[in-house]
């Protein structure tokens, strides 16, 4: 669509062949669940310029690259252990196109907080991304509170996967209602519940309605499959300021084309795919 604003994707991964090969090898010996087998591997690009070309073709201005830390629920090791340098290869060479989100390991709190502070203050990262499930603690566990306090200090948001998890680990610890505790205990912390919160969509919507500091992530789903409750929310007076768009590696052009087909008001679409991300992450 020619009048579509340049989009900002708030959820992506390191997508180099080297990283994907490392991730594929790490999953050997892990239990792979039915959905993960059906969907397949994360996307990869032969080079970052190739990725930029695809972004340009789709009308995507910026992509957030997450330093994802994923703990194995079964084998108790960091089987997705994205290094800061793997994100920096995007953000330092192409700072106008890529935004970094640091990772957090609640089992290595001191080291994690030091790396987060370095990522934000030295390298310009704009927040932190958390994949909680394999750690087998809920989002409002006290091991998470040092992270939330640090992000208040640094004035950056925390993005957390909320809802079910694709990988072979229980989903309960990512329930969106746990953001209710965090928002109450850290009213100055900007929180993003990513991945729509499904199957607890209404929980995430309720928390976003209640708190000024919680945002709704419309990512990891092709928009044509979004529940009507989500579409109604992001098209509503109170919801249109709280929702941000991302892909989690799904194809940009198809996703944005499907956003165009949701019947959103023009201002709601503009805020969803661009303006709200700029506000949330202070771009």
Regions found by a protein language model. Give the residues of each.
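Mid-to-C-terminal alpha-helical segments outside catalytic/metal-binding sites
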Residues: 2-62, 118, 238-244, 252-283
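Conserved, mostly hydrophobic/aromatic
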Residues: 11, 55, 87, 119, ...
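Flexible loop residues that form catalytic
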Residues: 13-15, 68, 133, 196-197, ...
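Short aromatic-enriched loop/helix-cap "lid" or pocket-rim segments at secondary-structure transitions
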Residues: 18-23, 75-78, 113, 170-172, ...
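Conserved phosphate-coordination/catalytic loops
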Residues: 42-46, 78-81, 110, 138, ...
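Alpha-helical scaffolding within the catalytic cores
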Residues: 46-54, 82-88, 114, 176-179, ...
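Active-site gating/metal-coordination segments in enzymes
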Residues: 61-62, 67-160, 164-166, 170-173
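Catalytic pocket-lining loop regions of alpha/beta-barrel enzymes
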Residues: 122-127, 136-244
């Amino acid at each position: 669509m020619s009048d579509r604003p340049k989009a900002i994707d708030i959820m992506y991964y390191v997508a180099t062949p080297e990283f994907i090969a490392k991730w594929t090898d790490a999953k050997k010996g892990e239990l792979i669940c039915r959905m993960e087998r059906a969907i397949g591997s994360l996307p990869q690009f032969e080079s970052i310029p190739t990725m930029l070309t695809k972004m340009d073709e789709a009308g995507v201005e910026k992509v957030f690259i997450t330093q994802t830390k994923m703990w194995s629920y079964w084998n108790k090791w960091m089987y997705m252990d994205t290094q800061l340098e793997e994100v920096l290869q995007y953000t330092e060479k192409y700072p106008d196109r890529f935004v970094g989100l640091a990772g957090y390991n609640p089992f290595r709190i001191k080291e994690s907080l030091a790396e987060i502070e370095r990522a934000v203050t030295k390298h310009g990262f704009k927040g932190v991304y958390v994949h909680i499930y394999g750690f087998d603690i809920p989002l409002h566990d006290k091991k998470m509170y040092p992270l939330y306090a640090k992000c208040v200090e640094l004035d950056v948001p925390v993005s957390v996967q909320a809802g079910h998890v694709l990988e072979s680990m229980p989903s309960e610890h990512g329930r969106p209602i746990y953001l209710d505790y965090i928002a109450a205990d850290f009213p100055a912390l900007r929180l993003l519940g990513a991945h729509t919160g499904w199957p607890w969509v209404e929980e995430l919507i309720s928390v976003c309605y209640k708190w000024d500091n919680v945002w709704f992530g419309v990512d990891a789903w092709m928009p044509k499959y979004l529940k009507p409750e989500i579409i109604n929310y992001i098209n509503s007076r109170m919801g249109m300021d709280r929702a941000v768009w991302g892909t989690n590696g799904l194809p940009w052009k198809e996703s944005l084309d499907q956003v165009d087909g949701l019947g959103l008001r023009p201002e709601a679409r503009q805020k969803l795919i661009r303006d709200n991300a700029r506000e949330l992450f202070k771009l």
